[in-house]
């Protein structure tokens, strides 16, 4: 990525961010350029992704400045967000003043400190300069009179596509015309919804399929098709030729490719994801750029060569002078009385203290306020082991922020101990449910599955289940087939109208009852028989990954997970592994509400597999030999936390011992109250909701079943911290559902491997989730996906606004906004708090270069709490 300073004159230059571009072949060039976009997963397996994951070698500030310059995208919170947060008490003014003093101390300037501070204090109010001042003849005349001051110049380092510089006779920008064509070809090639008519030659790749059809495209003019008639057969040759004919010098080609990738980051992100899934499509990004830039050449060729194509940008001094007049209280007369050196110093200072710098200081003050509030909340004094209350059940929940309120209310209502662990429970598996031919990678998307686990049933019971499932699927298949067929699609409304009309009326007016009826009907009809898993290792050459586990692998995964949460002794009679899932209707983003650690799927499958492994005699015997002795009367069970309705659904309960049965009954007895309290807390945070809720659980079910409900739950909005430590650190704290919680006992981690594993796995997932919510909040027009009510699900891949927009990569407006003008999510970078001695943190940072880079470059924040309870910011 090419990030260059905004001006070249030394007095106005910001921190040098030049990155040299060396000669590379086209593959390397495209690979380097691809860092500016993030892979985009299909919406059916919606995985939180960090939009700047390829740019972490640069600082957050550098990337923010580059995006502002290259795409006019602001990734700092807006002034309205900052003012709102300050009004709510989320930003302490003292932290802003500390930040300003540090910034002033770091700068070299030759104006009185008092003058600089006065200017900064006024500028930090984030008021816009009045348009009347900026356009005043007096100001512009003053700017002309002192124009002899050389403010420097710059080349357009972002290398905007040439098409973006041209308008056709209709007044349409040619980049919009180009995007229209590219969206069409991407939809045709990437379509994953089983269209009746697929793109011809699709199996040969995007470029060759496009090359075969482009000369017949009626949307292009005759001259445009003529340009592409004898175009190279291979993508690399086409891309090289197009860049040459457009006159893009080799030194600027990477930046030019970046500009094109950023023009449609959603479609380009989906292309990049596909290129990473198979060897067959590994050159897909090159093919995409070859198609795009070849078409750009055809469209812009009549306008070439452009006049002033390489014109340099000048830094306008008008807003710089205006800022000193408005914020620094310097009149035009005083300006004229200054020497050129004094004027230059003032302009340089105003330039350095730009909008991004001001918002950066506000963001850091906001983050420091949150850290200080969290520091005051959490208890740093761990209870002595013998002071712990006797527990009858231990429940392990996903680290998901939605688990925190549920765990808190559960612990208050009974003798229960809860743990936090990544919801895939450390099992790198691909799951295949009963009767399915497809497997799902049920683990974080940053990992690859190593084992395939299939759900199995008795042959006779399975046949009966399969028949019922075929009846259910045949109805859906028939409807979809009729819908796609040219003739039957005209008959379908007449046939299905009355039934669908009745469904629409009942779904709209009595959603909870109808939704519950349909759900129960399908549940009874498709009731699974008793199932088991293919846990034992089977060598199958037809499978890419082995089925099941060896004995050593079973023991290893159980040991690893138990040690990770510090559960190696004092087992309760009942240990429950709790995955989590969501429940909503008519929601394209359903996968976004599922378990991120399970690749956008429910976590129950993993929970059940892990609990089953823990109950195996062979596993217990091996663990006992290693010192992890699980009592005979301790039973592992599995459940699923339904986050939309805050209920616990049992999915695996083996035969229980007497003590375990007592614990089970205890959990069942308090669960209605837990659900009531958790639902009440969660529902009152939804906008325009009545503060007095007679029956919170009933209301939660209505939200889950109502197909017109745009916000069935807040998901992971307002997430802000990831706390790694023992439960005692946070047990009595109301963390407001804003913290990822992962158990960790540094005393059982002498070499630091467990901590390193938590940071590399769950820590990375939490960071991706955090930055996706951050990006969708601060730049919803670029990194979000707009309003849910106007979205179109396209090609089985994702959503668009209308039928000719980018493939929208982020979260919808309803996931982060409370109203048109007020945000719900607080855009703060993730604060990772680790409960461990200082030497553990130092070792982690020394050994994990990637994590150290994230901390140093401002992509995450880091703090620690040592054994004496001392808090340290890193």
UniProtKB/Swiss-Prot annotation:
GO terms for molecular function: zinc ion binding. Zn(2+) binds at residues 398, 400, 580, 595. It is a peripheral membrane protein. One of its GO terms (cellular component) is plasma membrane. It comes from the Bacteria. Coiled coil: none annotated. PANTHER family: INORGANIC CARBON TRANSPORTER SUBUNIT DABA-RELATED (PTHR38344:SF1), UPF0753 PROTEIN AQ_863 (PTHR38344). Forms a complex with DabB. This is Probable inorganic carbon transporter subunit DabA. It comes from Bacillus cereus (strain Q1).
């Amino acid at each position: 990525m090419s990030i260059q300073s905004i001006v070249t004159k030394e007095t106005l230059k910001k921190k040098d961010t030049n990155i040299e571009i060396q000669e590379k072949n086209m593959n390397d060039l495209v690979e380097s350029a691809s860092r500016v976009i993030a892979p985009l997963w299909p919406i059916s397996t919606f995985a939180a992704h960090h939009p700047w994951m390829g740019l972490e070698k640069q600082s957050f500030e550098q990337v923010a400045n580059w995006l502002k310059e290259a795409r006019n995208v602001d990734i700092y919170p807006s002034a309205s967000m900052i003012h709102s947060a300050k009004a709510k008490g989320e930003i302490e003014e003292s932290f802003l003043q500390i930040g300003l003093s540090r910034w002033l101390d770091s700068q070299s300037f030759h104006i009185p400190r008092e003058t600089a501070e006065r200017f900064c204090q006024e500028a930090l109010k984030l008021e816009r300069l009045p348009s009347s001042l900026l356009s005043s003849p007096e100001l512009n005349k003053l700017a002309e009179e002192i124009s002899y001051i050389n403010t420097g110049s710059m080349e357009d380092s972002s290398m905007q596509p040439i098409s973006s510089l041209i308008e056709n006779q209709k007044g349409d920008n040619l980049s919009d015309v180009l995007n229209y064509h590219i969206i069409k070809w991407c939809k045709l090639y990437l379509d994953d919804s089983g269209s009746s008519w697929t793109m011809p030659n699709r199996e040969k790749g995007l470029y060759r399929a496009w090359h075969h059809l482009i000369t017949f495209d009626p949307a292009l003019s005759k001259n445009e098709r003529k340009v592409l008639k004898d175009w190279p057969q291979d993508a690399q040759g086409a891309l090289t030729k197009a860049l040459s004919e457009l006159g893009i010098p080799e030194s600027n080609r990477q930046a030019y490719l970046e500009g094109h990738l950023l023009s449609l980051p959603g479609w380009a992100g989906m292309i990049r994801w596909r290129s990473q899934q198979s060897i067959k499509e590994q050159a897909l990004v090159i093919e995409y750029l070859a198609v795009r830039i070849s078409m750009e050449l055809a469209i812009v060729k009549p306008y070439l060569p452009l006049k002033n194509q390489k014109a340099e940008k000048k830094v306008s001094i008008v807003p710089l002078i205006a800022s000193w007049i408005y914020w620094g209280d310097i009149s035009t007369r005083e300006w004229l009385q200054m020497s050129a050196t004094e004027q230059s110093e003032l302009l340089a200072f105003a330039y350095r203290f730009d909008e991004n710098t001001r918002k950066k200081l506000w963001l850091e003050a906001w983050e420091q306020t949150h850290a200080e509030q969290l520091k005051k909340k959490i208890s740093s004094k761990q209870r002595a082991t013998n002071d712990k209350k006797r527990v009858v059940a231990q429940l392990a929940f996903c680290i998901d922020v939605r688990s925190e309120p549920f765990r808190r209310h559960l612990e208050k209502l009974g003798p229960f101990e809860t743990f936090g662990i990544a919801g895939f429970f450390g099992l790198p598996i691909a799951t295949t449910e009963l009767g399915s031919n497809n497997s799902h990678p049920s683990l974080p998307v940053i990992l690859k599955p190593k084992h395939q686990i299939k759900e199995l049933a008795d042959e006779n019971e399975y046949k009966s289940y399969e028949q019922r499932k075929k009846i259910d699927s045949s109805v859906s298949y028939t409807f979809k087939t009729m819908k796609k067929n040219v003739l039957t699609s005209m008959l379908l409304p007449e046939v299905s109208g009355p039934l669908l009309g009745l469904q629409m009326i009942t779904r709209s007016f009595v959603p909870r009852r109808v939704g519950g009826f349909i759900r129960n009907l399908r549940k009874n009809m498709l009731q699974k028989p008793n199932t088991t898993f293919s846990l034992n290792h089977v060598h199958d050459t037809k499978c890419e990954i082995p089925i099941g586990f060896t004995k050593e692998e079973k023991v290893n995964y159980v040991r690893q997970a138990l040690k990770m949460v510090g559960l190696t002794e004092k087992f309760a009679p009942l240990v429950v592994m709790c995955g989590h899932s969501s429940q909503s209707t008519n929601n394209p983003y359903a996968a976004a509400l599922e378990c991120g650690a399970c690749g956008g799927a429910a976590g129950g499958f993993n929970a059940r597999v892990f609990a089953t492994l823990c109950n195996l005699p062979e596993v217990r015997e091996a663990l006992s030999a290693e010192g992890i002795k699980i009592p005979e009367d301790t039973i592992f069970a599995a459940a699923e936390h339904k986050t939309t309705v805050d209920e616990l659904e049992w999915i695996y309960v083996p035969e229980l011992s007497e003590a375990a049965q007592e614990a089970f009954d205890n959990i069942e007895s308090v669960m209605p109250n837990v659900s009531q309290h958790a639902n009440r807390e969660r529902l009152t945070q939804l906008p325009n909701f009545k503060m007095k809720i007679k029956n919170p659980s009933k209301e939660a079910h209505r939200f889950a079943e109502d197909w017109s409900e745009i916000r069935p739950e807040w998901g992971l909005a307002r997430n802000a911290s990831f706390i790694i430590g023992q439960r005692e650190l946070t047990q009595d704290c109301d963390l407001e559902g804003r913290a990822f919680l992962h158990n960790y006992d540094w005393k059982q981690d002498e070499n630091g491997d467990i901590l390193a594993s938590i940071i590399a796995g769950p820590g990375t997932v939490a960071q991706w989730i955090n930055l996706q919510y951050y990006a969708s909040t601060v730049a919803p027009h670029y990194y979000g996906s707009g309003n849910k009510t106007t979205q179109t699900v396209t090609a089985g891949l994702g959503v668009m606004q209308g039928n000719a927009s980018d493939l929208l990569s982020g979260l919808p407006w309803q996931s982060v906004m409370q109203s048109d003008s007020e945000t719900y999510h607080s855009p703060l970078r993730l604060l990772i708090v680790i409960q461990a001695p200082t030497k553990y943190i130092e070792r982690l940072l020394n050994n994990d270069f990637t994590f150290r880079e994230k901390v140093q470059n401002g992509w995450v924040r880091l703090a620690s709490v040592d054994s004496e309870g001392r808090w340290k910011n890193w």
